[in-house]
Amino acid sequence: QKVLDNLSLEIQKGEVIALIGSSGAGKSTFLRSLNYLEQPDSGKIEIDNFMVDFSTISPDEILTLRRKLAMVFQQFNLFSRRTALENVKEGLLVVKKLSDQEATKIAKEELAKVGLSDRENHYPRHLSGGQKQRVALARALAMNPDVLLLDEPTSALDPELVGEVEKSIADAAKSGQTMILVSHDMSFVAQVADRVLFLDKGKIIESGTPDEIIHHPKEERTKEFFASYKRTYI
């Protein structure tokens, strides 16, 4: 069984695309395939002048790909024995080979953008779930990725913590960060996305603006999804 079935998309610089659909539709698998965390047996990706064929990808190409595509997961994935500042600096030091002074400057700037300047010397155990996820977001943005991949970034959070993370993501979108977002929060999708793709069984069934897809879907499968969504969440 194919998890992804000839799925293809093009994203413009500064655009935010949201992937929605039922559980098992292939949304997270697609995101993880883009930066080769899942290993597709075929397909290509092109970012500016960098192009790679997944069927022949080399270790060097994987590293380049992951420099261009930063990912924020459902879970926080922070180093427990490093402070918020050290977590954000890590990729800058190891991947980008910046000096400690340069990495510290960028890390402080990114933590400030997500409202965590006063938590930069705190360890993850002393941070709330929302604060941990904002550190993860700052760490991804610090890498200055061509595209930011967000896989259900608020689904593991308590409801009262969701807003602070969504605000930080929305701020990044307003600043021109290109993003591909997987989310089940349709109000947030409507707020932040330029374009919404509805996936079913590894295929894009319908594409349009948030208003078109959420409020005026054309395809029967999309209509069924939103009828079920309204029963579940409203």
What are the functions of these language-model segments?
Residues V52-A70, K174, H216-P217:
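ABC ATPase NBD coupling module
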Residues Y123-L127, Q131:
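Conserved ABC ATPase signature
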Residues A142-D146:
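A short, proline-enriched helix->beta-strand linker immediately N-terminal to the Walker B motif
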Residues L148-D151:
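Catalytic Walker B motif of ABC-type/P-loop ATPase nucleotide-binding domains
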Residues P159-L161:
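Helix N-cap at the start of a conserved alpha-helix in ABC-type nucleotide-binding domains
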Residues V189-Q191:
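A short, surface-exposed alpha-helical micro-motif characterized by mixed small hydrophobic
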